[in-house]
């Protein structure tokens, strides 16, 4: 335990929290070719590769993911949620934070129903996460 005098001389340091989605916390000044501090909830990007990945040990599947070049020129891997998708190379997508626990290196999600990404067809419950419009009937 430090004494009061020690705490007066050197107060306690608060812990610095590391961001879970660092690519969303940078902007890019293309004129000066420098990164800027610009926190944003989502970013726009262009798909450079769309493919599947196998998850870590206890699970087994083919998870869909896309390699995305963001508007700040950072390349990331983003998960494509839901059943079926219409993404291909050069599709423009909106990316949000949020990792996929069983896919190493995937720390972002693609927002369904925004920009070039379609919503999930035939979805009736939990539609807002998958960009599906309310059915007419």
Swiss-Prot record:
An example Gene Ontology cellular component term from the record?
A: ribosome
Per UniProt, what is one Pfam family of this protein? Answer: Ribosom_S12_S23
* Gene Ontology BP, a term: translation
Per its record, what are the GO molecular function terms? Answer: rRNA binding; structural constituent of ribosome; tRNA binding
According to the UniProt entry, which residues carry 3-methylthioaspartic acid? 102
Q: Which superkingdom does the taxonomy of this entry point to?
A: Bacteria
The alphabetical list of record keywords is:
Methylation, Ribonucleoprotein, Ribosomal protein, RNA-binding, rRNA-binding, tRNA-binding
Chain segments carrying region Disordered: 1-55, 118-137
What is the role of this chain? With S4 and S5 plays an important role in translational accuracy. Interacts with and stabilizes bases of the 16S rRNA that are involved in tRNA selection in the A site and with the mRNA backbone. Located at the interface of the 30S and 50S subunits, it traverses the body of the 30S subunit contacting proteins on the other side and probably holding the rRNA structure together. The combined cluster of proteins S8, S12 and S17 appears to hold together the shoulder and platform of the 30S subunit.
Q: How does it assemble?
A: Part of the 30S ribosomal subunit. Contacts proteins S8 and S17. May interact with IF1 in the 30S initiation complex.
Protein family membership: Belongs to the universal ribosomal protein uS12 family.
Know the name of this protein?
Small ribosomal subunit protein uS12
